[in-house]
Amino acid sequence: MADKLTHLKQLEAESIHIIREVAAEFDNPVMLYSIGKDSAVMLHLARKAFFPGKLPFPVMHVDTQWKFQEMYRFRDKMVAEMGLELITHVNPDGVAQGINPFTHGSAKHTDIMKTEGLKQALDKYGFDAAFGGARRDEEKSRAKERVYSFRDSKHRWDPKNQRPELWNVYNGKVKKGESIRVFPLSNWTELDIWQYIYLEQIPIVPLYFAAEREVIEKNGTLIMIDDDRILEHLSAEEKARIQKKMVRFRTLGCYPLTGAVESTAATLPDIIQEMLLTRTSERQGRVIDHDGAGSMEEKKRQGYF
């Protein structure tokens, strides 16, 4: 009698099926690579889906120029080791305007450097499908998003104009200029992600592991001192409050907009144990999620991931 699939193997099989469906159904797909743990799992699944061949689509990083330095080093290392075709896009208009999260705030920085940057890249290369690592358990607007998330010709998401998804049947029909955002990890939880990383020994950015790091508390959020740019925007009193703490990150984004959590979880088993006990969302440290009520849904309506 054949062994029953474990919970993680079922999730793995579902995700691989979705990835293969997209590769077969669309003319020009791309995998968005944000360098975080979910991207690491999604990339691992994609490589499994087409092993021993190479990925039949490129990976793309929409770079805000404000990621953690360790993230950039990790990205370059993975691309070299895996032989990936990497596209990196930075919004030139944002660079020309000197957009940054300190002077312009999280909402404007995210809109110009992430949302507009993504739309520029999708238009430039003519991608008709884009894989993303979002999960339904992360945030309420993502909880109601389809696996195949339809976007109009301006990349906008209308939650009231989405297609039914029955069982594992997905409708990828689009007109010229329209596209689909595809979320193969929709049914995974944060705990599933960590258990899978542990079982498959997937490399991840070291920032996920607890270590002594320099941080400053701003509005209740622990912000890591990642490079000298942040010091230009701190007062003398704030600089005096910089201290070293044992912290790690549950989610990774632009470093001035991503809060660390105090933790001693320095190994994968430690992190899994911590996940079994925690009762807070991993996105509690994302400053952009607190821009206003329904801020994530509004960002997605404008074309955000």
UniProtKB/Swiss-Prot annotation:
Its EC number is 2.7.7.4. Heterodimer composed of CysD, the smaller subunit, and CysN. It holds the Pfam family PAPS_reduct. Belongs to the PAPS reductase family. CysD subfamily. It is an enzyme of class 2 (transferase). The keyword Transport does not apply. It comes from Azotobacter vinelandii (strain DJ / ATCC BAA-1303). This is Sulfate adenylyltransferase subunit 2. The keyword Nucleotidyltransferase applies. It catalyses: sulfate + ATP + H(+) = adenosine 5'-phosphosulfate + diphosphate.
